[in-house]
């Protein structure tokens, strides 16, 4: 896929100035007959050299933004192009000043830190109230509108409590901005809104002191220090930081999520009412934890276990998760087992349709396994990681389309592994799958190793 240029037209939208070039996507201002429109288009970066996570992030962002009620704390999704044809998101253009502009002139006055932080906390509270966790909070992803409201952008790594988390289900490494990432995110936990409060604390720390609380980790080993190493108290770096602000910041940055604030609304209240902030020993802390305490934390870091994720704001009844194992084209192992792939696909579809008719709550996870990206050979977009990923997603969607299920009940996963059975079993274990539907050569081994019920499907003789 070539890089879009200003002046290009996509589905009737004309691209204007490129506003942002990120690692996963480009953002363009859109043009109308009389000049710039109050809209932007986000286009995922696909093609040679681009990782498959770009596709996953695009799908995640589309689902989350589409589910949020219209409001000032996030951009409104206007239109989108399907991943099968031309993927893009058309969103409201947010006028405002980025938090990164204030950050460039840090340290800031405590009153300014509190005002900016309180508005940001209210924005977080609003998305948390709708069961969304941002999980990629950084100064570049926060804007302040002319009216003063904080607006969160870039929901490509976000989690929605009522939608499948494609990143949690397919990615095994920490994703997000390492400078602000919470300890539980490092361990792959993406369902806790208190992770956003940790990132908020890191931003407040940087605004108040001009320094990052944990520096800029460049290796996984450096990142894991966050499981046991607390930051230097802000007042030790800048005496002008008041004790109430240090109390708020360090409470947000607690390693144990149970020791943080319970909600972003509480953070907003404390920042707006400094005189009412209850001071603990955090407020007067002048040094990091002593070497003995740090040593003990480090020794127990290997077994560090955050508290379970809190219930959703609007807790829904648990719905069973059903994994359907499919294979299309050049996957690692054939599902055929002597029968045609088309016949087996239809048999699987028929079995899933019966299940959905019996249980209207179940979620269907359609998955296929492909070789790792390093095993790709050949030229052109089809031989790239993103090209192959999209091709397999298209096949999965085509298989599922006749089921006529609501979008929130279907997910599509392209798993990379040289061992297809192990990949399917790992997916089922990590995502607490309740039942697996499988056909062909993989069926016996999957059935013997699966952590859940397995239905082995065969095509009818006439098929």
Predicted regions and their residues:
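Activation segment signature within eukaryotic-like protein kinase domains
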Residues: 116-117
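Structural helix C-cap motif within protein kinase domains
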Residues: 209-213
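AlphaC helix of the eukaryotic protein kinase fold
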Residues: 48-67
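Activation-segment/catalytic-loop signature of the eukaryotic protein kinase fold
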Residues: 80
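Small/aliphatic-rich secondary-structure junction motif
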Residues: 315-380, 449
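Conserved short submotifs of the Hanks-type protein kinase catalytic core
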Residues: 84-98
């Amino acid at each position: 896929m070539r890089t879009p240029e200003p002046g290009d037209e996509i589905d009737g939208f004309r691209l204007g100035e490129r506003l942002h070039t990120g690692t996963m996507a480009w953002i363009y201002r859109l043009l109308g007959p009389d000049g710039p429109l109050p809209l932007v288009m986000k286009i995922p970066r696909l093609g040679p050299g681009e990782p498959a996570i770009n596709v996953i992030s695009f799908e995640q962002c589309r689902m989350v933004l589409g589910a949020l009620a219209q409001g000032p704390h996030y951009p409104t999704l206007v239109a989108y192009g399907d991943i099968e044809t031309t993927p893009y998101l058309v969103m409201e253009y947010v006028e405002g000043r980025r938090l990164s502009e204030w950050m460039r002139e840090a340290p800031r006055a405590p009153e300014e830190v509190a005002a900016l932080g309180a508005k940001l906390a209210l924005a977080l509270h609003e998305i948390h109230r709708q069961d969304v966790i941002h999980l990629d909070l950084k100064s570049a992803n926060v804007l302040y509108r002319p009216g003063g409201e904080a607006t969160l952008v870039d929901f490509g790594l976000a989690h929605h409590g009522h939608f499948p988390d494609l990143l949690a289900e397919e990615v095994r490494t920490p994703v997000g901005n390492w400078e602000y990432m919470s300890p539980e995110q490092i361990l792959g936990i993406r369902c806790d809104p208190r992770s956003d409060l940790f990132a908020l604390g890191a931003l407040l720390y940087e605004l108040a002191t001009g320094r990052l609380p944990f520096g800029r980790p460049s290796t996984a080993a450096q990142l894991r220090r966050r499981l046991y190493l607390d930051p230097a108290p802000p007042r030790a770096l800048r005496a002008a930081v008041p004790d109430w602000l240090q109390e708020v910041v360090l409470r947000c940055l607690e390693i144990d999520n149970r020791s943080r604030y319970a909600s972003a609304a509480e953070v907003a209240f404390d920042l707006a009412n400094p005189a009412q902030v209850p001071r603990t020993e955090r407020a007067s802390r002048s040094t990091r934890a002593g070497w003995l305490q740090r040593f003990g934390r480090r020794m127990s870091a290997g077994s560090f276990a955050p508290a379970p994720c809190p219930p959703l704001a609007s807790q829904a009844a648990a719905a069973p998760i059903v994994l359907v194992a499919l294979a299309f084209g050049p996957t690692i192992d054939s599902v055929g087992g002597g029968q045609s792939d088309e016949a087996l696909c239809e048999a699987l579809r028929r079995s899933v349709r019966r299940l959905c008719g019996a249980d209207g709550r179940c979620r269907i996870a359609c998955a296929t396994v492909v070789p790792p990206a390093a095993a790709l050979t050949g030229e052109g977009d089809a031989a790239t990681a993103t090209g192959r990923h999209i091709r397999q997603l298209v096949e999965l969607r085509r298989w599922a389309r006749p089921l006529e299920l609501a979008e929130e009940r279907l997910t599509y996963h392209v798993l990379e592994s040289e061992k297809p059975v192990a990949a399917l079993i790992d997916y089922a274990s990590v995502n607490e799958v309740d039942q697996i539907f499988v056909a062909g050569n993989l069926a016996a081994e999957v059935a013997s190793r699966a952590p859940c019920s397995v239905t082995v499907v065969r095509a009818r003789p006439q098929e």
